């Protein structure tokens, strides 16, 4: 290629869109190069901000919050112990009051904080985050207000020492922080829900960080958050969770390292010191499997009792009557009850003594035998005099000061009592988690089994190796992982245990026990998080058990909603309006080709249809039509006036009235005072004259500067007082009179807008408004003004329930339309899938080819108790068919202890509508356009408004038109009488308020 060809090629590349060429100078090339470099740097920096720096900042913030909360909790708990130590030697009753009062006070403060700042902070947070990641929006659940309430309330509740956890609430806290950071990065208008895909990625990372900064376990935190919040997880988001969790765990461990008392924080790193070899024998594996089996059964019982307790508090008539009016009684009573049972000088001495519930984990993991004799080599050593509670284990907490109690008694008492106390504590209206209590209970059970095995065979005689010791601490680790896995239905809890203990020598026993416990519990009960979702009636799709083939046999045609409401291409605006008004809870409407074929062509969201209807017959559309009509009428009047002027050019009958300043055209209206005893008008008192041209100008200003009232005229029957406005007999009256008659004939009225809308608009009233609305409602649908989803998800009527459940879970669907050869025959939403699953779980067998909604109810029917079942059957509305199950969804709105969360439907997020207009009842003046609004005292009467302006109003600096706005009281004969008054030059008397004086005109 020659040099000339290269130059021409470069010139062609640098041509602009206008056909011009840019000379190839060195300066231009340098600027282009620098510009490209700047854009590249900007793009790279934006990418770094949105991913790496964002995730690192999220991890660092959560680590700091976690460490700060642990420090505050430790000081609160130590404060209680110091107060108790001061008084326990003097008086038993005083010690009891101090112990109980301290706990009750903190719980009461936490409950008040959560109740009045943000009720969304109550509870764990993992169930709610599970629904949010599914696509549900919970009102104000990720707000700063909720974050503040959660942090304060959780610190107070954990500082009380009750059996509560921190892991679940911190998942919620991390999600809120992720949401707020997203708002800062992407702007306050967007937030976490601006992009649903983006929100899922960041919230998933936030959940992982919440677990990681609680246990300092980044790997287990990521895996656990995925298990409890996701059904299907996108692998591309894996690195986000690990990176943010690693940043959080790293900073958290560094902060603990520099903390003096870090070893005894509430959620500490429980380092164990088991030897790498000979931790367990193969002969012990059946015992570990048995621990998993028992923990699976106990975990199912725990979930069941928790659900029954919550439902009992909702349904019991006495609880309803008390807690509805005095909700503080419940937290006070439960806090008093739990703290009384744990009182160290009472029953508490058989459950660990003065050791706090959250601090017992390290004692359960200690590598010594509690039941060994004091002089045994494997016995737990006594603490030294200069040892602190952070680096020693005091066996006297579990055996008494004089070794009076057996560890079997104290461990058994601890498990039984705290098993029920943990359930009661989880029902309190305060921020609290459930992970840590079940973790401690599992460790206590494992320790009990380990001590029992040690008592029977302390030196491993079953193996023939006298050098081997049975280590109860290993059993405690296995029990903690197994029971926690059974309650939460997770396997990743084993990884958390490995990171908590810092050892992998007990990997095999832990995995065996966790898998068995998880399998047993999954067969008997849902996880604690799914149970809470059902209790709170949050919209979420339950899992399908793989133990029966009924889920493969039930077809969509047996639980779809049919017939359903749809929109056709030939539908009218009225059809759409009726559909929106009658089906207020449907979020999207299917669009079909026509009423006959019902061929599905797409779907339209409710918000789109609502905006379309508003644009056709809404307030703004009506105002625009009124403005068009008044302008058209005034233009016609102008043309008519010019025609008459041309035909009567020699007519000079118009007279001018001379004032002190000069001559002006006479006005048809006079403002004169009216005597108290009667409406006598003095015709020699005039305000000022308005020319015909100025009156026309005032009436043709933009609609935002003119305001008209309805012409439904009715004069109040009362004696007139104050001042009046009087018409004068002039020959030019026909022009202004014609305009007046035109306005009254059009029935334009004055309305009062909300304060945020200070503009004036024309409006239609009466028959004209009705005729216009009827005309608009009969118009055909204009598809060009709608954003149509042309590819809605469709399923065949023969799709199985199992396959539909998999598709909904994998793709994150909210609804799917059921078609037969392209013809729309029904719709299936998340609610129908959930009801079908619960139908099969209740033990019923569906009749082939028959809808489960049309089957006759039986005694065991889960639909029998629903008051809205018949409504759902009759209308076919998927949202109106709500059924009652044993989960207590019918009582979700009656929970006075833990207020229900409000679900925000995306279809309800429509633009703000104009509020209902109110009528003016008093006089107002504005400096921009000085005028007076005179209205009838009767609230039911309407007025006609005319704006008159002085001659020099058009010359004002800001171009605005000032003047006098007069609201003429209506007459019984309505607009026809107003026209008669104008044509006959009848004296019109308008009542003015007493504070209006002549100088204001």
Swiss-Prot record:
Gene: clh-3
Protein name: Chloride channel protein clh-3
Null allele phenotype: RNAi-mediated knockdown in oocytes results in inhibition of hyperpolarization-induced or swelling-induced current and in premature ovulatory contractions of gonadal sheath cells. Normal adaptive response to hypotonic swelling.
Keyword vocabulary terms for this entry: Cell membrane, Chloride, Coiled coil, Ion transport, Membrane, Phosphoprotein, Repeat, Transmembrane, Transmembrane helix, Transport
UniProt feature, compositional bias: Basic and acidic residues: 634-650
Top-level taxonomy: Eukaryota, Metazoa, Ecdysozoa, Nematoda, Chromadorea
Domain writeup: The CBS domains, the R-helix linker (543-562) and the C-terminal domain (833-1001) regulate channel sensitivity to voltage, pH and extracellular chloride concentrations, probably by altering the outer pore structure. The region (738-751) between the CBS domains is essential for channel activation.
Short sequence motif Selectivity filter part_2: positions: 165-169
Span of domain CBS: 560-619, 788-845
Database matches in InterPro entries: CBS_dom (IPR000644), CBS_dom_sf (IPR046342), Cl-channel_core (IPR014743), Cl_channel_volt-gated (IPR050970), ClC (IPR001807)
UniProt membrane topology term: Multi-pass membrane protein
Feature type site, description Essential for gck-3-mediated inhibition of channel activity: 232, 805
Assembly information from the UniProt record: Isoform a interacts (via RFLI motif) with gck-3 (via C-terminus).
Record-annotated membrane-spanning stretches: 49-85, 91-117, 142-160, 167-185, 238-258, 285-313, 322-341, 405-425, 433-456, 507-524
Residues at which chloride binds: 124, 434-435, 529
Processing after translation: Phosphorylated by gck-3; phosphorylation at both Ser-742 and Ser-747 is required to inhibit channel activity. Dephosphorylated by gsp-1/2 during cell swelling and oocyte meiotic maturation, which results in channel activation.
Entry keyword annotation includes Coiled coil: yes
Intramembrane segments: 126-133, 202-214, 218-226, 473-487, 488-489, 490-501, 502-506
Organism: Caenorhabditis elegans
């Amino acid at each position: 290629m020659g040099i000339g060809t290269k130059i021409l090629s470069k010139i062609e590349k640098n041509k602009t869109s206008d056909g011009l060429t840019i000379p190839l100078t060195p300066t231009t090339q340098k600027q282009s190069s620098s510009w490209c470099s700047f854009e590249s740097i900007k793009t790279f920096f934006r990418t770094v901000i949105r991913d790496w720096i964002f995730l690192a900042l999220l991890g660092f913030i959560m680590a700091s919050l976690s460490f700060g909360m642990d420090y505050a909790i430790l000081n609160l708990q130590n404060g209680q112990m110091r107060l108790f130590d001061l008084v326990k030697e003097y008086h038993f009753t005083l010690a009891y009051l101090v112990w109980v009062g301290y706990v009750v006070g903190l719980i009461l403060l936490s409950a008040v904080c959560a109740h009045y700042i943000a009720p969304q902070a109550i509870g764990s947070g993992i169930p709610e985050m599970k629904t949010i990641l599914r696509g549900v929006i919970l009102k104000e659940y990720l707000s700063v207000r909720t974050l503040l309430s959660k942090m304060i309330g959780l610190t107070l509740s954990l500082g009380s020492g009750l059996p509560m956890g921190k892991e679940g609430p911190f998942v919620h806290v991390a999600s809120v922080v992720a949401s707020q950071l997203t708002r800062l990065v992407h702007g306050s208008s967007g937030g976490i829900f601006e992009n649903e895909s983006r929100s899922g990625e960041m919230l998933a990372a936030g959940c992982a960080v919440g677990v990681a900064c609680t246990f300092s376990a980044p790997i287990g935190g990521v895996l656990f958050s995925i298990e409890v919040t996701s059904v299907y997880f996108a692998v591309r988001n894996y690195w986000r969770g690990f990176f943010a969790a690693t940043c959080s765990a790293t900073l958290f461990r560094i902060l603990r390292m520099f903390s003096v008392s870090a070893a005894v924080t509430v959620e500490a790193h429980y380092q164990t010191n088991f030897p790498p070899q000979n931790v367990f024998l193969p002969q012990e594996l059946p015992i570990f499997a048995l621990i998993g089996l028992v923990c699976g059964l106990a975990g199912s019982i725990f979930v069941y009792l928790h659900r029954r307790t919550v439902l009992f508090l909702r349904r019991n008539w006495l609880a309803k009557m008390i807690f509805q009016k005095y909700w503080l009684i419940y937290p006070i009573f439960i806090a008093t009850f739990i703290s009384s049972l744990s009182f160290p000088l009472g029953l508490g001495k058989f459950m660990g003594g003065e050791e706090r519930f959250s601090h017992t984990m390290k004692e359960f993991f200690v590598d010594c035998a509690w039941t060994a004799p004091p002089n045994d080599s494997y016995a737990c050593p006594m603490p030294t005099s200069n040892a602190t509670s952070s680096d020693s284990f005091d066996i006297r907490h579990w055996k008494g000061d004089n070794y009076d109690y057996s560890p079997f008694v104290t461990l058994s008492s601890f498990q039984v009592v705290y098993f029920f106390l943990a359930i009661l504590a989880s029902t309190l209206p305060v921020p609290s988690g459930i992970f840590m209590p079940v973790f401690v209970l599992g460790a206590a059970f494992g320790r009990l089994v380990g001590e029992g095995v040690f008592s029977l065979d302390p030196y491993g005689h079953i193996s023939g190796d006298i050098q081997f010791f049975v280590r109860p601490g290993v059993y405690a680790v296995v029990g903690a992982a197994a029971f926690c896995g059974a309650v939460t239905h997770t396997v990743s809890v084993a990884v958390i245990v490995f990171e908590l203990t810092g050892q992998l020598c007990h990997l095999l026993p832990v995995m065996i026990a966790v898998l068995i416990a998880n399998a047993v519990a999954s067969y008997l009960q849902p996880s604690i998080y799914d149970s809470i979702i059902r209790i709170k009636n949050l919209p979420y799709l339950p899992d399908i058990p793989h133990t029966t083939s009924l889920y493969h046999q039930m077809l969509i045609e047996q639980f779809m909603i049919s017939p359903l409401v749809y929109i056709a291409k030939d539908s009218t605006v009225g059809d759409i309006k009726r559909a929106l008004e009658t089906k207020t809870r449907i979020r999207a409407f299917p669009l079909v080709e026509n009423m006959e074929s019902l061929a599905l062509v797409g779907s339209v969201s409710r918000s789109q249809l609502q905006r379309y209807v508003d644009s056709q017959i809404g307030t703004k559309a009506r105002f625009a039509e009124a403005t068009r009509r008044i302008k058209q009428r005034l233009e016609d009047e102008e043309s008519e006036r010019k025609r008459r002027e041309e035909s009567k050019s020699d007519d000079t009958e118009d007279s001018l009235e001379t004032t002190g300043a000069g001559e002006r055209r006479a006005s048809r209206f006079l403002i004169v005072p009216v005597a108290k005893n009667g409406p006598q008008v003095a015709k020699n008192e005039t305000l000022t004259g308005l020319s015909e041209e100025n009156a026309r100008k005032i009436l043709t200003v933009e609609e935002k500067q003119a305001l008209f009232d309805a012409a439904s005229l009715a004069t109040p029957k009362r004696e007139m007082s104050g001042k009046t406005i009087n018409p004068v007999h002039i020959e030019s009256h026909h022009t202004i009179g014609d305009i007046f008659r035109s306005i009254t004939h059009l029935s334009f009225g004055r309305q009062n807008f909300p304060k945020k809308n200070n503009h004036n608009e024309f409006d239609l009233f009466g028959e004209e408004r009705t005729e216009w609305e009827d005309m608009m409602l009969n118009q055909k649908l204009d598809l060009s003004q709608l954003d149509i989803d042309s590819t809605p998800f469709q399923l065949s009527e023969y799709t199985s329930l199992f396959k539909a459940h998999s598709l909904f879970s994998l793709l994150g669907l909210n609804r799917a339309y059921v078609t037969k050869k392209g013809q729309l025959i029904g719709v299936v939403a998340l609610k129908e899938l959930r009801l079908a699953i619960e139908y099969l779980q209740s033990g019923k067998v569906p009749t082939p080819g028959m809808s489960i909604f049309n089957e006759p109810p039986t005694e065991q029917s889960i639909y029998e108790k629903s008051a809205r079942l018949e409504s759902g059957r009759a209308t076919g509305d998927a949202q109106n068919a709500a059924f009652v199950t044993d989960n207590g969804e019918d009582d979700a709105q009656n929970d006075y202890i833990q207020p229900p969360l409000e679900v925000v439907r995306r279809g309800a997020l429509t633009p703000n509508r104009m509020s209902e207009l109110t009528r003016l009842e008093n006089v107002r003046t504005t400096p921009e356009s000085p005028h007076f609004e005179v209205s009838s005292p009767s609230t039911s009467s309407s007025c006609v408004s005319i704006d008159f302006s002085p001659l020099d109003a058009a010359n004002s600096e800001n171009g605005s038109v000032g003047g006098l706005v007069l609201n003429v009281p209506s007459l019984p004969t309505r607009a026809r009488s107003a026209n008669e008054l104008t044509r006959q030059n009848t004296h019109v008397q308008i009542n003015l308020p007493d504070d209006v004086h002549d100088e204001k005109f």
